Amino acid sequence: MSLLDRPLVVVVLISALWWACSRHRRPAALGRLSVVAAALAAATVVFDGPHWQLVPWQAVGVAVGLVAAMRWWRPGRSRRAVRVLGRGALGVGLVVGALALLTASVPQLPTPSGPHQVASQIFRWTDSSRPETLTLDPSDHRQVVAQAWYPTDTSRGRRVPYFEAQHRLPSSVAGLPSFMYAAFGEIATHATFDAPISRTQRRWPVLVFSPGLGVPREQYTALCTELASRGYVVVALSAPYESAPTVLAGGRVVGQTVHPDVMGPPPHPELQRLIDIRAADAGFVLDRFAALAIDNRHSPLAGHLDLHHVGIVGHSLGGATAVQVMATDSRFKVGVNLDGKLFGTQPDARLHQPLLWIQSDDPRTPEYTGGRDRLLAGLRGGGDVVTVRGSAHMSFSDAPSYWTATGRTLLGNSAGTGSVALAAMTRTTADAIAAFSAPALGMAATATMPQVLAQHASLRREPLVAAAGV
């Protein structure tokens, strides 16, 4: 909460209860308190924005000011109507406000647990070999935006904000109105910009990360920074025009203009088109990183990326992208699919790289399980399938931090964020990814998959791999 938020709640609570419950009011004192409540409500809207945890309190603050004004304006005939309507409205507002504070929180990201501090650098490139097919401008070329999270030995430097475009958000972000993200400027990412990469080893393995459909790359900051603190260079890709906000080269902010029919019947050609674009983005990023040491000596990453040990991780549509990338680009040595349903010909891929499938505890459709099992049956490089108990589809993002513990228990499953706290979900997911991918990426494993399963009671290994003959 900001400096104004707590006074707002206290003053609004006192004045609203006074109006709603007291039979012996002191109009002058109550009127002045109501004016203060309305002023605080207006001030928080102006300076902090109408973020979701405080909207009911801001509304009640304005309401008590209006009730006071109405009593002064028409102290006679309207007194009874004002009293009845005012008590009811203020009572409802207080209940809603209390529920908002009880269930919704200003998000806080867990501190990364690895031995390294975390730094970040953002890259913006144009792929002149590919036209941009998601805009109507025939002269557009594909712009690729990548944010690298990497290990560093220092915590000093300019802090990385949560949303790069925090003050230029479009009207909607990940399907929610932008005012709900007003408090996200307070989120600590536990990372600094452009710090030197850690000198504890010469080169670092790379994990490319592909986000879910319509979800900004920033909303996976907890997982990306956790993996970076353990010694990976995690390259989170934006998906311009299908997620918002994305800051392109030159500083232009674009929103979500692509809305594919995700609920339509198979084969989902629109989604397959997006997967093809994302897969090409991932390959292009590796090409650019290969040239980084020559083209950009000023980057902290130049000369320090182990491009012989590259993996890919993706959530939801990003998970399907990871499978496609593995099937078409042998530079990626290992892959992780976080609850991603497959599309098109992906279930028939014969992957020669190991694949880890981490799925949520959500009910699964026949289309999901059918595609998954067909892919597992054709694996050539080995694999594993685990379920995180209590998780939901969006648990792999930062979304669980939007709720308090009470909110997760009451609303987490219906909201698609599950009942697992973000810190626990991040640690569990990162432990599984690190244990599974370490051999393929030349890392010294701190734990094996059986050890990770023993350490985390929330992880359940599925018998699907053995049944599929992997």
Regions found by a protein language model. Name each.
Residues 241, 248-304:
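Alpha/beta-hydrolase active-site loop
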Residues 285-350:
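Primarily recognizes the serine-hydrolase "nucleophile elbow" in alpha/beta-hydrolase
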Residues 333-395:
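The feature captures the conserved acid-bearing segment of alpha/beta-hydrolase catalytic domains
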Residues 86-88, 377-470:
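C-terminal catalytic-base region of ester-bond hydrolases, centering on the histidine
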Residues 28-72:
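Membrane-embedded alpha-helical segments of integral membrane proteins
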Residues 78-105:
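Internal/C-terminal transmembrane anchor helices
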Residues 187-247, 364-366:
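Short substrate-entry loop that stabilizes the transition state in hydrolases
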Residues 100-207, 415-422, 435:
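Domain-level recognition of soluble alpha/beta enzyme cores
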